[in-house]
Amino acid sequence: MNVYGTEQIRNVVLLGHGGAGKTTVAEALALLTGVTKRMGKVPDGNTISDYDKEEIKRQFSISTTLIPLEYEGEDGPIKINLLDTPGFFDFVGEVEEAISVADAAIIVVNCKAGIEPGTERAWEMCEKYNLPRLIFVTNMDDDHASYRELVVKLETKFGRKIAPFQLPIRENEKFVGFVNVVKMGGRRFTHLSDYEECEIPDYVQKNLTIARDALIEAVAETSEEYMERYFLGEEFTQEEISTALRTHVIEGDIVPVMMGSGINCQGFKVLLQAIDKYFPSPDHFECIGVDVSTGERFTAKYNDDVSLSARVFKTIVDPFIGKYSLMKICTGTLKGDTVVYNVNKDTEEKIGKLYILRGKDQIEVQELKAGDIGAVAKLTVTQTGDTMAVRTAPIVYHKPQTSTPYTYMAYKAVNKGEDDKVSTALAKMMEEDLTLKVVNDAENRQALLYGIGDQQLDVVISKLQSRYKVDVTLSQPKFAFRETLRKKVKVQGKHKKQSGGHGQYGDVIMEFEPSGDLETPYVFEEKIFGGSVPRNYFPAVEKGLQECVLKGPVAGYPVVGLKATLLDGSYHPVDSSEMAFKMATILAFKQGFMEANPVLLEPIASLKVTVPDKFTGDVMGDLNRRRGRVLGMNSNHNGKQVIEADIPMSELFGYNTDLRSMTGGLGDYSYEFSRYEQAPGDVQKREIEARAAAKDGE
């Protein structure tokens, strides 16, 4: 593959709902640019993008795949770095990594299915990152798909930015071509995406006039001169129209709508032309980071005439091909067989061979210019988000923003002795996927696996088996309850063993009551008068307390909110010891705690649920059924409602799946631990019984 300059590069991410046809679009573009000789098909398991065993088995994308294409553009050859992303939200981390290095996006929409949750999420991401985009409508070969209705829905949903650049031509209800609204000409498909000029059908004229007028109005808004000419009724040249539209697309003021058929490979030649003509090269943007040597903000255009800096945006770890670090060159030129400086790790790394990845294939290249995307194998310490530079110019870029995982399950190895193998395998998988997280819950003696959703966790378990040959089971996690008391009691604890020789004697009278602070295990005070218990035994009494609150007598959970006061007691000048007073305290605690109306406390989360307005009633009703307390609701900048509530952590188990079901995949949520509250009686009873059964089974 040739080396391309910054201005020749187009970094384009494919976005859209799962099943909309993103991978088919990638296959069609690969065919037309000579990468392949025939289009792969997802059901056949032979596409460039979906080469992983899990993707072939499940017939949908799980990881982002890079597919570089070489295309002869209007002003010379260009390189299109196509990033094919998963459509299912469980794999949103892959999408976020791809968007972080993309300079433009193609949102793929199935004409028959229309606007789906993945369409809306793709649009929101483009808005968030100010990404120029176009919408490519697939499935135009379906006789029952209405392009006109879809465009109306797109305009209603996303506003005046939507601009159809094409209108369909149908004969006998078959999709045979399109009208180019920009050039005002008919195009009839001949072979694959090739076409010939044809007459514009009369039935298109009305919609064509509306679409054309909107485009010309957008052109007029480019400058005062154009606006004046527009009001005078002057015509714009084709070059003026194309240049103005390109400006609007790059600035995000216009989102072209184009169309095609994946099955028949129609419409993709024009899509390639649009990528070349309307999408920006990286030098339209700035790299923003921090100059480590000065601590000041660093900004620079993508430019290969300065020192090297590159950002690692993705890591691939494969048991067979090894580890690859994918990076976008921000400034300078990256060459093979050189030493670079990892700014985040403050260490140097040896760059061996330099590669372009195309699906599972590695293509060796000599160098990569600013704005380009490539891969380096077997870097020792480098991870996703790290910045590679030169030691004399240490620039560090921000790590890609990835969604926080809130869905979690307990996991354990099926076979004894494989815990280390599982941990090693998961560590490698977490290098690849930043939305995966492992937490060791020592209190409940369980290991927790966090992800975006159940589907992602299912894929992880399957990959552990197929890639790393370890079997792992998932189960419902245990939740961290607490124990406390509700009334004041006064008890005696006496530890006495005196049967000849040196004995044991400790005697305490203690008061136990609520401290009012559920964030602190205990508060200890002493009110001894007259030396009934010598002061040197006070620490032993507190040690007994420290041991007791680790595991309460109700269900074995830690104790919180306890105030213990040593009031009185007695001692023996020979037989008393620190151990004896510690044991006496333990006896007093066990008796007193159970007499003081003990209760279980459950963890409460502060929850935020973001949903479209029409789903708020269903969501709030569901929260009430989950024992949640809705605290309030307000609108965010996307016009969605943000519901705030307090809810028991245990009631959030399975919430991800239920929320998606209620909102058609358009609901998001986040939560954090807030505090402990007394659990209802039935919950306490169920938990105590479960803990007792688990203890009996040990």
Q: What is the meaning of each model-derived region?
A:
Residues M1-E698:
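Structural and coupling elements of P-loop NTPases
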